[in-house]
């Protein structure tokens, strides 16, 4: 459960990164594909080379969904309901991949905003990413 300070911390992080959705999203995906190559199996039709338009486009969607969840932090489930349906019923993404993506996103935030990512903010962002992952996997049950 996200506390009031967690919510404030998360909103503060996303206020800093909102204008960089495409870049940070692409970097997150590239990092995930390199670190966890098994995640590439969900993107057989993508050009997975650094800087590809497909990676940038999907990265922008990923970070856009995180921004949407942060903007509706009191009801993440409602804000990501359609995305949850898509990933569970159509794409059938292995739920562990949401955790892997979250870890890579944390690294990207740390690289670009080291002074923002204090231990407290890191913990809040991690809790938020876990909450997002839980919402995205809720319809698997």
From Swiss-Prot:
Q: Which SUPFAM superfamilies match?
A: Globin-like
Determine the domain of life of the protein's source: Eukaryota
> Does this entry carry the keyword Iron?
yes
Q: Which cysteines are joined by disulfide bonds?
A: none
User: Which keywords label this protein?
Assistant: Heme, Iron, Metal-binding, Oxygen transport, Transport
Q: Which GO BP annotation is one of this protein's?
A: hydrogen peroxide catabolic process
Cellular component per GO, a single term? haptoglobin-hemoglobin complex
Which GO-annotated molecular functions does the record name? haptoglobin binding; heme binding; iron ion binding; organic acid binding; oxygen binding; oxygen carrier activity; peroxidase activity
Domain Globin, chain residue ranges per copy: 1-141
Q: Which family does it belong to?
A: Belongs to the globin family.
Describe its partners and assembly state: Heterotetramer of two alpha chains and two beta chains.
Q: What does this protein do?
A: Involved in oxygen transport from the lung to the various peripheral tissues.
This chain's protein is named Hemoglobin subunit alpha-A
């Amino acid at each position: 459960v996200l506390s009031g300070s967690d919510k404030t911390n998360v909103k503060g992080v996303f206020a800093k990164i909102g204008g960089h959705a495409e870049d940070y999203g692409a970097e997150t995906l590239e990092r995930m594909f390199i670190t966890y190559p098994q995640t590439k199996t969900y993107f057989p039709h993508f050009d997975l080379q650094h800087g590809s338009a497909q990676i940038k486009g999907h990265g922008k969607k990923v970070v856009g969904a995180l921004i949407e969840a942060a903007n509706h932090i009191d009801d993440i489930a409602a804000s990501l309901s359609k995305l949850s349906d898509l990933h569970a019923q159509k794409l059938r993404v292995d739920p562990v991949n949401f955790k892997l993506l979250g870890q890579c996103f944390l690294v990207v935030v740390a690289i670009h905003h080291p002074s923002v990512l204090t231990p407290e903010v890191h913990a809040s962002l991690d809790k938020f990413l876990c909450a997002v992952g839980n919402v995205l996997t809720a319809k698997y049950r």
